[in-house]
Every structure is written in structure tokens, then in C-alpha cells.
């Protein structure tokens, strides 16, 4: 059978994505909270070795009929963490700007070379809302202010590598979710933001708008608009009208 048919069969196979008890570990296990779990440092060799896996995944996606792939660079997952790796000393993936963006740029370049007819894009954190030197896209003196100098520099590189569109986001949904997902009432156990949701939403709009105006030829897709509820279409229309 074709690769697409084989993938579909696997997805529809219940046992493919769920192991019946007894099991020793589950995909959802969070080892961060596990007692005596040793956090393993991701050495440079390990990070460099990830690039072929991205290429393999992109190759399979194209063979399965996909037109594009999204290389995640947001919400403090691996690539996002590296963008803010100011304190990673003596590493090809930390410190200087060129080092911190290295993994993402290397992955994009490798995927483009291996699958040239596959559209490549990313969901990119523009502003982590974490104090420097732990946050990307933040003002070094005041973390409540965004500084998009480096994010825009990265976007220019990604466009040179063939990006035609980009999805923007900010903050970390697991740590400071109100920045990227404004809400009225926090979930149980979550903090209460010290600002009105409209302020959070307006900040997100301003940050995304700065990127769109800096790169008018780039299709910029915003996020975090759901708080506007029934007014979302009106807001979207106004944003498009105002560029």
C-alpha cells in the first residue's frame, strides 16, 4: 500500500496510539515531577544530531501528501528554549545570537534542501515575557516590555530561507498564559493576572503588528484572539484594514 494509506491505517489502529494496561510508562508521563529523576543536559552533539530527524519527518510528511510543515519555535519547547539560551556557555547553541538560532536555522535549511517542494513555516515566540537572560524578545532592563530586535533579525533569516508565512505567539501557556491566552477567570490553582485581559490582548496585537509592518511581504498569522469572542471577526477585519 502507499505510504499515505499505511499512515492512515496506523492512525486508525487503536493499539497504535494506546497501550492497554499493564504498562510501565505512558506518553503523558511528566518526568520533571518524578522523584529522583535526573535531568539530562542536551549536549551540542545531541542537538546537532536532531537535524536528520526533522528532515526524516518532513520527508515523510511530503510523501504522505502534506504541502507544508510547521517547525515549532514557541512556548519554551526545545527550539524556543535555545532562542533564549543566553547563559549556555561554551556552546554552539548558546550565547551569541547566531548560536541561539542555530538549531532552527540548520533544521530549516536541511529540510528545504531535502524537500524543496515542501512549504516550511514556524509558530514563533516573539516575546517570552521572562526576565533577561532567560527570555527571548524581552527588554533587558524591563521584562514587561518587548524588544523585537532579535526576533525580527531571525525572521529576516527565515524569509531568506524560503518562509512565506509565520504564526506568531508570545509568553508560555504553562507559566504565564495570560500573555498569549487572555482569560477572565483563571483555572483552579492558576494565578490571577495583574492586568485586564484587554491589556494582554492589546499587547499581543501590537507585537504582531510590529512584525507585519516590518515584513509586509510575509503572511503573518496572529494568535490569542479567542478572548474577543463574538467580536473576533470585527477585530480581525479592523486589523487587516489597518495593515
Where would I find each of the regions flagged by the language model?
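Flavin-dependent oxidoreductase catalytic cores
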Residues: 1-243
Amino acid at each position: 500500500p502507499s505510504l499515505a494509506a499505511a499512515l492512515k491505517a496506523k492512525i486508525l489502529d487503536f493499539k497504535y496510539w494506546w497501550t492497554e494496561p499493564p504498562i510501565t510508562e505512558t506518553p503523558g508521563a511528566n518526568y520533571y515531577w518524578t522523584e529522583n529523576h535526573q535531568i539530562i543536559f542536551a549536549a551540542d552533539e545531541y542537538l546537532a544530531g536532531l537535524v536528520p530527524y526533522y528532515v526524516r519527518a518532513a520527508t515523510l510528511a511530503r510523501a504522505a501528501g502534506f504541502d507544508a510543515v510547521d517547525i515549532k519555535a514557541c512556548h519554551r519547547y526545545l527550539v524556543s528554549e535555545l532562542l533564549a539560551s543566553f547563559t549556555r556557555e561554551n556552546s554552539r547553541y548558546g550565547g551569541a545570537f547566531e548560536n541561539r538560532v542555530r538549531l532552527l536555522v540548520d533544521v530549516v535549511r536541511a529540510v528545504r534542501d531535502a524537500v524543496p517542494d515542501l512549504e516550511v513555516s514556524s509558530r514563533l515566540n516573539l516575546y517570552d515575557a521572562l526576565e533577561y537572560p532567560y527570555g527571548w524578545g524581552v527588554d533587558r532592563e524591563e521584562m514587561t516590555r518587548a524588544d523585537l530586535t532579535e526576533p525580527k533579525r531571525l525572521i529576516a533569516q527565515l524569509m531568506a530561507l524560503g518562509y512565506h508565512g509565520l504564526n506568531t505567539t508570545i509568553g508560555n501557556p504553562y507559566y504565564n498564559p495570560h500573555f498569549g491566552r487572555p482569560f477572565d477567570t483563571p483555572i483552579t490553582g492558576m494565578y490571577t493576572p495583574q492586568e485586564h485581559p484587554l491589556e494582554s490582548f492589546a499587547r499581543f496585537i501590537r507585537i504582531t503588528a510590529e512584525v507585519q509592518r516590518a515584513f509586509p511581504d510575509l503572511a503573518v498569522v496572529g494568535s490569542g484572539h479567542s478572548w474577543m469572542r463574538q467580536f473576533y471577526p470585527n477585530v480581525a477585519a479592523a486589523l487587516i484594514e489597518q495593515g
